[in-house]
UniProtKB/Swiss-Prot annotation:
Organism superkingdom: Eukaryota
Keywords from the named record: Disulfide bond, Hydrolase, Protease, Secreted, Signal, Thiol protease, Zymogen
CDD domains xref list: Peptidase_C1A (cd02248)
Organism, as annotated: Paramecium tetraurelia
Protein name in the entry: Putative cathepsin L 3
Length: 308
């Protein structure tokens, strides 16, 4: 009888603990959903909560490791599987398209310190649209205007998404093609042509207000990219498949050196680590930025183009 009571008590405690853990998981999910304005049907809610808890455990296990150089954290992507994240936020990886101009001779750097242009353009949120290529170009334009002392502008990314027919809107594109469009047509203000995170019919029938003089390929080596970053930020192609839950630190966990996303290189630190501004909002990363190890980490040297 005593053994039976002991077993019953242990079972009761284990069951209570299990339900307590389940309740904690549910509460965490509910808090996340409220913070991120996510609303689900009852059937989808169970599915999304399962993904949330799986991602949460993966993040916790990663952060407990002593051999990692970066931390993961919860963000707006918590209820997306890795496959869904790649499909919704990144474009198809394509390293076969040759958009590169003439190769550059390697620049010899002397006495060039750290560079940081983060304060010259604001972090944007692309939403569920693979438009990082367009944001990297419109943000390049904004930073160029600000650094040259012209004015603080908000260039329309949606205009590039809708009207640059050499690219494919929310399905992806290439920074050099987008810069060619800005060179020919110019951009209007985002106030007049706001971002909606989806493909639309082009609404711009006249030339824009903000133009560039040209653009050039500035990659091929660490020293080249650093040299040109000393002037202005640079639109770069990157391989971002594993960026989903990046929170802070130095990142090098790239799936390859291909290109499935575009972002804005805004500087480098005294240890030559790259500082890259993304377009996934400030809840992601280091207030919207990621730091990458030097050299060609995540393919950053493959498709860097700079406006001038």
């Amino acid at each position: 009888m005593k053994q039976f009571l002991t077993a019953a008590i242990v079972t009761l405690l284990m069951t209570a603990g299990y339900y307590h853990l389940q309740e904690d998981d549910t509460n965490d999910f509910e808090r996340w959903a409220l913070k991120n304005n996510k609303f689900y049907t009852e059937s989808e809610k169970l599915y999304r909560m399962e993904i949330y808890n799986s991602n949460k455990r993966m993040i916790e296990e990663h952060n407990q490791r002593e051999d990692v150089t970066y931390q993961m954290g919860e963000n707006q992507f918590m209820t997306l599987s890795h496959e869904e994240f790649v499909d919704l936020y990144l474009q198809k990886s394509d390293s076969s398209v040759n958009i590169m101009g003439a190769s550059l001779p390697e620049v010899q750097l002397e006495g060039l310190g750290a560079v940081d242009w983060r304060n010259y353009t604001t972090v944007k949120e692309q939403g569920q649209c693979a438009s990082g290529w367009a944001f990297s170009v419109s943000n390049s334009l904004e930073a160029w205007y600000a650094i040259r002392g012209f004015q603080k502008i908000n260039a329309s990314t949606q205009q590039i998404v809708d009207c640059d027919y050499n690219n494919t809107g929310c399905s992806g594109g290439y920074n050099a093609y987008a810069m060619e469009y800005v060179l020919r047509v110019g951009l209007v203000s985002s106030t007049n042509y706001p971002y909606v995170a989806k493909n639309q019919t082009c609404k711009q029938s006249r030339n824009g207000t903000y133009f560039i003089n040209g653009y050039s390929f500035v990659g091929g080596s660490q020293s080249n990219l650093q040299y040109y970053l000393n002037n202005y930020p640079i639109s770069v192609g990157v391989e971002a498949s594993n960026w989903q839950f990046y929170r802070s630190g130095l990142f090098s966990n790239c799936s390859s050196n291909g290109t499935n996303h575009y972002a804005l290189a805004v500087g480098f630190d005294s240890a030559n680590n790259w500082i890259v501004q993304n377009s996934w909002g400030t809840q992601w990363g280091e207030s919207g930025n990621i730091r990458l190890y030097p050299q060609n980490t995540c393919g950053i040297l493959n498709y860097p183009y700079q406006v001038y």
